[in-house]
Amino acid sequence: MGYHNVKYGKKAQRRNYSKTIYDVDLPNLIEIQNQSFDWFLKHGIKELLQDFCPIESYNGDLKIHFDDYFLAPPKYSIEETKIKDISYVAQLFVKTTLENVLTGETKQSNILLTELPLMTPTGTFVINGTERVVVSQIVRSASVYFAGNFDSKLNRTTYSGQVIPSRGAWIEYEEGSKEILYAKLDRSKKIPLSNFIYALGFDSKEAIENVFGKSAIIDSVFDKETDMDSDNALVELYSKIRQGEKVPVDTARDFIRTRLFDQKKYDLAKVGRYKFNKKLDVLTRAENTYLACDFVNPETQEIIIAQDELLTKEKIAILKQNRHFLLQEIFDAKHNLENETDEEILAYKKDPQKNELFTKTNIINSRTGEVLVAKDTLVNDDIINHLRHNIHTLDEKVSKFFLGTKDIYQKEADRQGVFNEILEVYTSKDESGKLYHKVKLIGNDQRETKKHITLSDVIASINYYLNLYENVGTVDDIDHLGNRRLRLIGELLKNQFRIGLTRAEKNIKDMISTSKFSEVNGPGDLVNFTFLMSVIKTFFTSSRLSQFMDQINPLAELTQKRRVSALGIGGINRDRAGIEVRDVHNSHYGRLCPIETPEGPSIGLITSLSTYAKVNKYGFIQTPFFKVLHQDGKTTLSRHIDYLTADQEKEEIIASAGFVLDANNAFKDKKIIARSNGETGIFERSQITYADVSPKQIVSVATSSIPFLEHNDASRALMGANMQRQAVPLLIPESPIVGTGVEYRAAKDSGCLIIARESGFVTYVDAQKIIITKKPNQNVSLNGKTLYDTTQEFTYAQAKALYENNYKEHQAEYTLINFAKSNQDTLVLQKPIVVLGEQINEGDILVSGPSTSQGELALGRNVTVAFMTWEGYNYEDAIIMSEELVKHDVYTSIHIDKYEVQTRELKKGSGQEEITREVPNVGADAIKNLDERGIIIPGSEVKEGDILVGKITPQGNIEPSPSEKLIQIVIGEKAREYKDSSLRVPFGEGGIVQSVHYFSRKNGDVLPAGVNENIRVFIAKKRKINEGDKMAGRHGNKGVISRILPKEDLPYMADGTPIDIMLNPLGVPSRMNIGQILEIHLGMAAKKLGIKVATPVFDGVNDYDLKEIMKEANLDPDGKMVLYDGRTGEPYDSRISVGVMYMVKLSHMVDDKLHARNVGPYTLVTQQPMGGKVQNGGQRFGEMEVWALYAYGAAHTLQEILTVKSDDIVGRNKTYSAIVQGTPLPKPSIPESFRVFIKELQSLGLYVELIKTDTKENEVNKSLIDYKKEGYN
C-alpha cells in the first residue's frame, strides 16, 4: 500500500501518498515576525539606550542618564483600534536621571520616549485602523569582500576588495592603471595602497617587510615610493577625504582615529564582527598549503606540526587549538593608531600593578597662569570635577584628555598593542617534491570582540588582498546567502530608533547646555523626543517595507509575513538591479523559494522564505538537515536535526530527499544523489554527512500547496503560486480533494483562525463567542459540594459545573469576528467548528474563517472539468461554465464597501454642518430608510444615488436663483440657508447596509481637528460569478469566463452527470503544466471513493499510485470517457479527459472593471477625457487603434474620434448644440493637444503658425474666448 491515512487537526483526514519515512513538522510559520519584535522589546531598546547614555552638556556640568524603560498597557484593544481608526500602540517610557556632575545631585522622572506600535499575536501592526505588515529586508552583510575580474589587456585576473561595516566608513582596495594598487577610505579619492599602509603607523619599507614579508607583490606596491613615512601618509589620506584640505598631522591622526575606531561613528554590529573574524581567519587560507617552518610550542619547545607538512583539515584543527602561539605584536600600545600618542596622554601609572593614574605635568589656567592641579597628583573624581568646574580656562588638549566622552581609566584599560596571527606557508610543490613559492599569511586577532574595526582587521584585510595575487585565498560571491542576511522587524525598528535618537540627542545637548540644574524641575523639562516619534510614524506609514496587509485570503496573509524584499532603504534599486542579483542561487536551497516571486519589474528582488527556513541571531537564513552517522561500516540516518546557514552547508555533503532507508534507518543504496558546495552529484554513502529533512523544504508555503508541482513548467508554477494569493473568499468554501498536506498548517499559522491557548472542554458556543473551561490546578468546592477533585479525571460534567457557577478564573473566552471588512473589502466571518461538550487540546483550531474549511485552507471549489472545445467559446484560455454553479452559489463571494462622511466646523460666523433627516429638495421616498438622526438603518437595501447619511451645509450669503426662491417660499427659510451635502451611494454601487459606526466629539471619541462627527456606513453586496470574471487552477492555468451555459446545453456523462466547466485542451501542451491533467484524474478517483488525498510536492502520487487509485475507483486507465452533447444527445467523436479540478475565483472581477462613460471630466492641459473607472473616464483610442482605422480607410470615423469625441473644445460644444437642435454636425476645429504641441515648440524657440485660408488668421493662437465672440454656439 503506497499511502497512509493522516489526520490534519481534529476535523480533517487525508490519504497521504508521501514516501518519506520521517514527517518533520513545519516550524511556526510566522515566528520570524513575533520573535524578532520580542527581541526588540527586551534587548534592542536596552542596547540603544546604552549607546546614547549618558548625554552630557558641552561643558560637562550636567548629564542625562537613561536608567531603564517600560511599556504602559495599550489604551485600546486591537478590535477597538480597528473600529476607531487609530493605531494599536503602547506608550514607551524611559526612567531618566538628570545629574549635576559638580555637586552629585540628581533629579529623576519617567519621560515618554514614543508611542510604539505593538505587534498583534498574528504578526501584524494596526496603524490608523488598518492592519499592516513589515516585510523582512535582505541586504549584503557587513564583512570583508574580495572580487576578481579577468583583464583581457593584462591577460590576468585583477582583484578588488571592500571592508564594509554595518554603519561607518568603507575601506576599498582596487588595481588601477599601470598595475598600481590603490586604497580608498569612505568613498574618497584613491591613494596608493603603499601610502595607506604607511598611514597605519609604519615608518619605513623595512618595517612593512618585517610584517608583510618580502615578495614580488610587496615589491611592486612599494617600488615607486621613496621618502614616505607615517605622518606624511596620514596627512595625504586626510587631504583625499577632505577634498585637498591640509592640516597638521595630529589633526589628521585624530580624524582617521574617529572615523574608524570610534564606536559612535563606526559600527560592525555582532554580525560584522562574526563575519570579519570568519573571513580574516588565517587558518582558513592556510588549508591545503605546506608549513614553511616548524610550529613550536614556545613554552615547552615541543614541535606541534613539523615543517613542510601539508595542512589538512585535521592539521588545521590542531592549529586552531594552539592558535594563541600564532599571535605576534605588530605595534605596541604606544604606536597603535587606535590609541592616543604620548604627547596626547597627560596621565601615567607610577606602579604598573596598581590601577592609579597621576598627572604628567602641572595643569595650568591658560588665562591666569595659576596651577590648577600639580604634577604627579592622583587623578580621582574630585580632580576631574575641579577641572570640569574650570573647563573654560583649560587648554584644549587637557580638556579633551581628562573631560572627553571616555573615562581616562577606561581609556588606559583599552590602550593595547596590535596583535595579528601570522603563518608562513609554501603554496606549491614541484615534480621532485620540492616546495616553493613562500607566502606570509596574516590573520586578524581572533580574540577580538570589539564592535568597531581594529588595526589588526585592517592589516589582515590588506594581507588577504595581496595574497590573492599570490593565488592564496578566495574571492566572494556576493549573491551567496552566506553574504546576504535578513533585517527583520526588530532590527529595522532599532535602526529607525537610532535615527530618531541621534536627532533628539543634539536637541537635548543644546537644552542641557543652556540650563541650570537649580532652575529645572527634572529631566522632563530638558528632554524632547518629538524627532523619534516622527521617525517611527513615518516608518510605519510610508516605508517601502511597511505594507498594507494583503488580507484577501489566509495564504496571502501568511505569504506577506514571510516575504523577503531586497528593495527599500539600504537595499537594491529596482531600476539598477541586474540579472545576477535576481537569479536563483544554489545557496537558496531550503532558504528562499526558487519559484514564488512577482512577474513584473520586481522579479527576483521580492521572494519568499522556504517552508522550513529559520533566521539565526545574525540574520542569516538556516535550513534543517538530518545528521548522518557512520558506525560499524553502516551509514544511518539519525533523528537529530541541525539548522545550517549557507556558509556552514558549504563544508558538508548533503543527501537529497529521495534516499531509501531500510528498517534500521540505514541507507540502502551504495551511491547516493547529494549536494556538495552547491553542486549536485553522485557520492558514496560513506561520504554523506547530512540529509534533507523533507522534499518540500526547497519551496515556499504557497508553492508547496500546488499538487504535482514537479510536473509543471517553472514559470507556470510561479503563476500558480502567485494566483492562489488572489483567490477571493467564497460563500461556501471547500478544501481541495487533491491537496498536498500543507493546507492545515498554512491556515493555522496564517492568523485568520482562533487557536485554543489551553486545553479544556467547550462549555459555551455561539456565533459571537466560545468559552472553554480548563482544568483547575487545585480542588474546587462550593457550599460543601466538590466541583472538582485533583485526584480524579477532569470531565465535561465538572467543566460544566465550573462554568455554571461562574468560575471565571478557569475559563478562556474567545470572541469571534462577525461580518468584518478586510483590507481588500472582502468579508471576514468566523464560524465555530467545535460543539458543546467537545474536549479541546491546546493548539486546536476552534473556528473556520474566510477561505478555510474544517481548519484547512479552502481557496476555491472542486468542480468537474472536461478538456474540450465548445463552439469556439474557450478560445485563448477562455472558460465555459455551467449555470448550476451560479444558481447554487458555488463561486459566490461577499464584498463590503465602506462609505464615510464627516461634519466639520466651518469658518467663524458660517455655522456648522449638520446630520439630519430634513434634507432640502428631496422627496419622502429618498429618506424613507433613514432613522430619526438622518442615518441609514442597517439592513436596508440601497442602490446607486440613494442617501446613506442626510447632511446639510450652510450656504452663506449667495443670491438664490428664481426657482430656488420659489422653493424657499413654499418650504420655508431652512431651504434658503442650507444646501444638500448628503452621503449617497456612488455610481455603480449598492447592496445591503450591514452596519453603521457613529463617532462624535460629544461622546468623547478621538476625531481629527475641525471634525465634530464621523459616520461610516458599511454596505455588503453578494457577487455571483459572471462572464468576464477571472478564474484559475493551481498550475498557472488561468482564464476568463466567456459563456455561462444552461444545464441542458452542457455535455454530460453516460450516467447523465453534466460537466461543470470546460477548458481548452490547447492550453496544456504549450504551457507544459501537466500537473493539471494528473490532478483531474486523481481528483475524479478520490471523489468516486469519497476521500481526500495529500500528494506532497516532489514526494507524492507516482504513476503506479495513480493507476492503482483509478483502478480502485473503477475508472478507465487513461482517465477519459465518452461525453454526450447536451443539445443533440449525440456522443462526441472522441473520448474526452474528464476529472475533478480545484479552481479558484480571482479578485479580478468584471464588476470592478466594466465601465461606460456618458459625460465626465477632462484633463486640464490636453482637454482629453480622463481615464479609468474611478474618474468616470473614457476608453483610450491609442496609436495602434488609429492604425487600424487607417487600414480600413475610415477617414470620417477617425476624424471624429481624434477631434470632437476627444479634445476639440470648440468642436465638441458645437456638436452638442447641433445634436440638441437637430442641425447637421459642424466641421471639427483644432484639437487642444495640437495647441499644446505648438506651445511646446514655441518654448523651444520655434514659431509655428496655422493660417486659415479664408480669414488669414493664425488659428493656433485663438482662445476659447475668441471663438465665443464669433458666436460658435
Curated annotation (Swiss-Prot):
GO CC annotations, alphabetized:
DNA-directed RNA polymerase complex
In alphabetical order, the GO MF annotations are: DNA binding; DNA-directed RNA polymerase activity; ribonucleoside binding
The EC number of this protein is 2.7.7.6
- Entry coiled-coil feature ranges: none
- Which GO BP terms apply? DNA-templated transcription
| Signal peptide bounds | none
CDD domains (alphabetical): RNA_pol_B_RPB2 (cd00653)
- Name the Gene3D superfamilies on file: 2.40.50.100, 2.40.50.150, 3.90.1100.10, DNA-directed RNA polymerase, beta subunit, external 1 domain, DNA-directed RNA polymerase, subunit 2, domain 6, RNA polymerase alpha subunit dimerisation domain, RNA polymerase Rpb2, domain 2
Matches recorded under SUPFAM superfamilies: beta and beta-prime subunits of DNA dependent RNA-polymerase
Name of the top EC class for this enzyme: transferase
What keyword terms does UniProt attach to this protein? DNA-directed RNA polymerase, Nucleotidyltransferase, Transcription, Transferase
**Reaction equation(s) it catalyzes:** RNA(n) + a ribonucleoside 5'-triphosphate = RNA(n+1) + diphosphate
Instruction: Please give the family membership noted in the entry.
Output: Belongs to the RNA polymerase beta chain family.
Purpose of the protein: DNA-dependent RNA polymerase catalyzes the transcription of DNA into RNA using the four ribonucleoside triphosphates as substrates.
Assembly and binders: The RNAP catalytic core consists of 2 alpha, 1 beta, 1 beta' and 1 omega subunit. When a sigma factor is associated with the core the holoenzyme is formed, which can initiate transcription.
Q: What is this protein called?
A: DNA-directed RNA polymerase subunit beta
**Species whose genome carries this gene:** Onion yellows phytoplasma (strain OY-M)
Q: What is the lineage of its organism?
A: Bacteria, Bacillati, Mycoplasmatota, Mollicutes, Acholeplasmatales
* Gene of this entry: rpoB
